[in-house]
Amino acid sequence: MTILFLFLLLFLLMFIGVPIAVSLGLSGALTILLFSPDSVRSLAIKLFETSEHYTLLAIPFFLLSGAFMTTGGVARRLIDFANACVGHIRGGLAIAAVLACMLFAALSGSSPATVAAVGSIAIAGMVRSGYPQAFGAGIVCNAGTLGILIPPSIVMVVYAAATETSVGKLFIAGVVPGLLLGLILMVVIYIVARVKKLPAMPRVSLREWLASARKALWGLLLMVIILGGIYSGAFTPTEAAAVAAVYSAFVALFVYRDMRLSECPKVLLESGKLTIMLMFIIANAMLFAHVLTTEQIPQSIASWVTELGLSPWMFLLVVNIVLLIAGNFMEPSAIILILAPIFFPIAMELGIDPIHLGIIMVVNMEIGLITPPVGLNLFVTSAVTGMPLGATIRAALPWLMILLVFLIIVTYIPAVSLALPNWLGMS
């Protein structure tokens, strides 16, 4: 009865248009008040526990780092470097946009931020060179999802907090899948470009390539600092996020000098707004997850699945279906916090590696970001291009098939996610 009330109330509130965060919090709070022996105080305690979770402290720092990198002109230099590397190939500007998304993803940890930073520059450049606007918008919208797969990743931080999994291992596990997805997108773009006879830029000289690499160096160094620092043990992922924020501010203000000190309050305010919005969603989702845990739903489902005799591949198929459906209607962090505690104990029973499960969930969240009606990347792409939302959806959906094929690869070939952590002795 309790669980039926919880989920029916959640779906009812979402159906009548109540914001997702409020729906999660309200359904969880009413369930506790009406059916649980817990006191009203537990509501406040659970909500405030979010703000003191050490792992989640990485989120505002990564958001701040991405804000400084975007405002400070790092994205433009990364795009110039990507164009210098692959622009001479047929379809090179589109391939360069994917490469730029991969590079910026390694700095920001956010898919919408990656789309906004790269799309605002790369799509306009493609249109000027004769590419259809819809082609460029579809590519950047999909490639921008790499922002939560290539480390650092805010969604990975949330999964780690929900399941008590190592953030460092998740970051390392995301490297190979992120590079593989980027490579697959590039190959498909090249094939399409050959068929459609899309233009190529003149090959740059070695001097020009070195000049673009030198300008992008300070941005590229941040990737080495984050991953190198975590793997070497110099600092934890949360400390790495703080280092990234300070480093990004230093580069934007004193190295590239694309920002003035007077612009810092605006950057801090914008990243603060994003942090508050995301943490409000996370706090309410954690309250909802608390109700699930109190009612022992994950344990009950795990026992039921074990009794059914589901094989690991069948369970992972169910996981993907549930996550793909949820991704159409909910924000990634909320999905992770609600469903990860349910799937996690079942995966442990079936011998599925928690890191592998985490990467599968992240890839599903990538797909959710580009599927209507609430795919955030679609709205960001529409905003930076000026295209109607319907046209943006039509531009992005053909590329969605690539992500679905990639999801199958990641799901049923665990080595894609686990090979690098195992090789580095992090298993």
Curated annotation (Swiss-Prot):
Molecular function via GO: transmembrane transporter activity
Principal place of residence: membrane
Domain of life: Bacteria
Annotated keywords: Cell inner membrane, Cell membrane, Membrane, Transmembrane, Transmembrane helix, Transport
Compartment list: Cell inner membrane
Biological process terms in GO annotation: C4-dicarboxylate transport
Gene Ontology cellular-component annotations: plasma membrane
Residue spans crossing the bilayer: 2-22, 55-75, 91-111, 115-135, 138-158, 171-191, 216-236, 237-257, 274-294, 310-330, 335-355, 359-379, 396-416
Comment field (misc): The DctPQM carrier is more efficient than the DctA carrier for the utilization of succinate at micromolar concentrations, whereas DctA is the major transporter at millimolar concentrations.
SUBUNIT field: The complex comprises the extracytoplasmic solute receptor protein DctP, and the two transmembrane proteins DctQ and DctM.
Job of this protein: Part of the tripartite ATP-independent periplasmic (TRAP) transport system DctPQM involved in C4-dicarboxylates uptake.
Protein name: C4-dicarboxylate TRAP transporter large permease protein DctM
Biological source species: Pseudomonas aeruginosa (strain ATCC 15692 / DSM 22644 / CIP 104116 / JCM 14847 / LMG 12228 / 1C / PRS 101 / PAO1)
Taxonomic lineage: Bacteria, Pseudomonadati, Pseudomonadota, Gammaproteobacteria, Pseudomonadales
